[in-house]
């Protein structure tokens, strides 16, 4: 595309990803904001957080978001026996299926700690990230936006969380900037 003979700069293609949900208070706000912008994201869910939030999973599915696994209770997989790690993932997969009718194909290992051999035993692909907004730590919209603006490039996978108001607000501002 060109405008007056000048190339039109395309915004970078990015993936917004959210860990640790679903959160009864903040995830619905995030889903509403994404829907208004016609944006699909990836949500990596903690199994024990699904109880009582099944309607949120159904909304995620209805809106076309990717639903992934983030273990049952946010354990660092490379610090526990392989069988326990497999069960963390399997239990969460089963709970996601019970709540949404789909088995996830992707897993986001907490802390990015993945055991390569697990791909064979759980038949899932790990999803990592290259932009960590540290939203869970700073809980500051300006700080989160600054990190995103400095680090995002075409193909970036942005790590955020859907359990804080500041994260929801920052995510929607990031969406407005890059989509």
Task: Please name every model-derived segment.
Residues 29, 51, 75-179:
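Catalytic domains of cell-wall/extracellular-matrix polysaccharide-remodeling enzymes
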Residues 1-80, 84-91, 95-98, 102-103, ...:
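Active-site beta->alpha N-cap acidic-glycine motif
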